Amino acid sequence: KLKQAYFVDIVPEVAEKCSAELQEKLGFAVESVAMDDRKSAVRKSDIVFTVTTGSQELVYFDWLKPGTFVARLGSYQEVHLDVITRADKVILDRWKYVSPRIPEVIQLIEE
């Protein structure tokens, strides 16, 4: 059962608004986190979702606890290469759609 969530956005006001809305809907604590403080939120998390259209790396492998589940739902560029290449498992839905967008997966296969 989820007990805590963190919401990060490049615009602090957006993070605060979305956190408040989600907390009301979900019924558990949702804390807004400044972009510069995202490392601390990732380190405390068992599940990390990234949803962005940006190309900035937002999550790094050494921030993750062992066993953390990471779902990339955005631009496919929001995690550092090591998050993919050092993962225990990489799960894809449709190869023909994903393979051209995620060169790290091709790199894993070639290794």
Predicted regions and their residues:
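NAD(P)-binding Rossmann-fold cofactor-contacting core
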Residues: 2-26
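A structural micro-motif
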Residues: 3, 28-30, 68, 88
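Generic secondary-structure signature for well-ordered alpha-helical cores
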Residues: 20-27, 47, 75, 95-96, ...
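Rossmann-like NAD(P)-binding element
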Residues: 31-59, 63-64, 68-78
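Rossmann-fold NAD(P)-binding glycine/threonine-rich loop
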Residues: 63-111
